A protein has these predicted regions:
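Beta-rich nucleic-acid/ligand-interaction surfaces
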Residues: 84-85, 136-148, 183-189
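Conserved PLP-binding active-site segment of the aspartate aminotransferase-like
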Residues: 149-153
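Acidic, glycine-rich loop-and-beta core segments that form the ion-binding/anion-interacting portion
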Residues: 159-189
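ATP/Mg2+-dependent ligation/transfer catalytic cores
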Residues: 1-137, 154-168
Length: 189
């Protein structure tokens, strides 16, 4: 495969890569009418060596180094915060910088979050819980509603895979709902 189409820092002249599925990441796509299996992949150079600059390989090396240096296991607990961006609704508007663990009708996108959590769990994600967050704000006629999905601790590589799948699921659901999402951590001051 042409690696320059995957990673902007790879030059087209030396961009031959192999994309190899990591079968333990396989999950049934929750959005297709005909069941299909989706799989995360790792990247290898033309000689079959792991691509040094691939994010999953960097994490794998860091994890191994941590274990060798400390003798400890490295687990992570992802907290995926995101904003749903939508046209303001007149009834029960959210208040700026309020809404922590709020419920409907003040939170507009709890259904999207709940659907996302179900799809993430079905794809192998280990979820602790989800809730609305405090970072709500408005600009003109546009509202930004902050939500969070928190994961249970697991080894750092599996935790990263869960977050990759979760972001894809949330973006796909947002497209189905006709809204935008951003995973920017804080977009107001």
């Amino acid at each position: 495969m042409d690696g320059s189409s995957l990673f902007s820092f790879i030059e087209a002249g030396s961009s031959d890569l192999y994309v190899v599925p990591r079968y333990k990441t396989a999950f049934v796509n929750p959005f297709t009418e005909i069941p299909s299996l989706d799989i995360l992949c790792s990247y290898f150079d033309k000689d079959g060596n792991p691509l040094e600059s691939a994010p999953d390989y960097i994490l794998k090396k860091a994890h191994k180094s941590f274990q060798e240096t400390t003798g400890m296991k490295f687990e992570a607990m992802g907290e995926l915060e995101y904003y749903v961006i939508f046209e303001r609704e007149p009834l029960f508007p959210a208040q700026d910088q309020k809404g922590y663990h709020e419920s409907t009708p003040f939170v507009k996108w709890d259904e999207l979050r709940t659907e996302a959590m179900m799809a993430i769990a079905q794809s192998g994600g280990k979820i602790k819980y989800g809730h609305s967050e405090v970072g709500n704000f408005s600009v003109g006629d546009t509202d930004y509603e902050q939500n969070e999905i928190e994961f249970l601790p697991t080894n750092v590589e599996d935790s990263a895979d869960q977050l990759i799948k979760a972001k894809w699921i949330i973006r796909t659901l947002a497209a189905h709902y006709g809204v935008e999402v951003t995973f920017a951590p804080k977009i107001t001051v």
